[in-house]
């Protein structure tokens, strides 16, 4: 073996370099003119985004409504405690 092997020569996998030349290896490709990777991308982006958002809406809306209602009740109760009518209850709560 004098010199470097030809670039198209199979040298073998790691640990067993220098194996015999491989036979009957076939490579299949598709023409770049036949493949249309972005066909319908804009159309599908709009409708797929709408469908996915619609399907996830309740998973976001229900917890939002629950947290919002708890937050507003707590805010209103806090405002009530610091009014003239709520002072007595505030004294009871802050034992």
Curated annotation (Swiss-Prot):
InterPro entries, per the entry: Cyt_bc1_su8, Cyt_bc1_su8_sf
Superkingdom field: Eukaryota
Subcellular location: Membrane; Mitochondrion inner membrane
Cysteines paired by S-S bonds: none
Residue ranges of the TM segments: 57-74
UniProt-recorded Gene Ontology molecular function terms: ubiquinol-cytochrome-c reductase activity
Organism name: Candida albicans (strain SC5314 / ATCC MYA-2876) (Yeast)
Similarity annotation: Belongs to the UQCRQ/QCR8 family.
Null allele phenotype: Leads to decreased vegetative growth on several carbon sources including maltose, citrate and acetate.
Record's bilayer topology term: Single-pass membrane protein
Alphabetical list of Pfam families matching this protein: UcrQ
Annotated function: Component of the ubiquinol-cytochrome c oxidoreductase, a multisubunit transmembrane complex that is part of the mitochondrial electron transport chain which drives oxidative phosphorylation. The complex plays an important role in the uptake of multiple carbon sources present in different host niches.
Gene Ontology process terms (BP): mitochondrial electron transport, ubiquinol to cytochrome c
Alphabetical list of SUPFAM superfamilies matching this protein: Ubiquinone-binding protein QP-C of cytochrome bc1 complex (Ubiquinol-cytochrome c reductase)
Protein name: Cytochrome b-c1 complex subunit 8, mitochondrial
Keywords: Electron transport, Membrane, Mitochondrion, Mitochondrion inner membrane, Respiratory chain, Transmembrane, Transmembrane helix, Transport
Subunit relationships: Component of the ubiquinol-cytochrome c oxidoreductase (cytochrome b-c1 complex, complex III, CIII), a multisubunit enzyme composed of 10 subunits. The complex is composed of 3 respiratory subunits cytochrome b (COB), cytochrome c1 (CYT1) and Rieske protein (RIP1), 2 core protein subunits COR1 and QCR2, and 5 low-molecular weight protein subunits QCR6, QCR7, QCR8, QCR9 and QCR10.
Induction info: Expression is up-regulated in cells that undergo morphogenesis to form pseudohyphal cells when co-incubated with macrophages. The promoter contains the conserved motif 5'-TGAAAA(G/T)GAAG-3' found in morphogenesis up-regulated genes involved in energy generation including ATP2, ATP3, ATP4, ATP20, QCR8, COX4, and SDH1. Expression is repressed during formation os spider biofilm. Expression is repressed by HAP43.
């Amino acid at each position: 073996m004098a010199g470097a092997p030809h670039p198209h020569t199979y040298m073998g996998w790691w640990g067993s370099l220098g194996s015999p030349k491989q036979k009957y290896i076939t490579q299949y490709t598709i023409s770049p003119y036949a493949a249309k990777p972005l066909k319908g991308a804009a159309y599908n982006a709009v409708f797929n985004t709408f469908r996915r958002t619609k399907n996830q809406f309740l998973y976001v809306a229900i917890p939002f409504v629950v947290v919002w209602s708890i937050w507003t009740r707590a805010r209103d109760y806090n405002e009530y405690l610091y009014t003239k009518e709520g002072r007595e209850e505030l004294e009871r709560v802050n034992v």
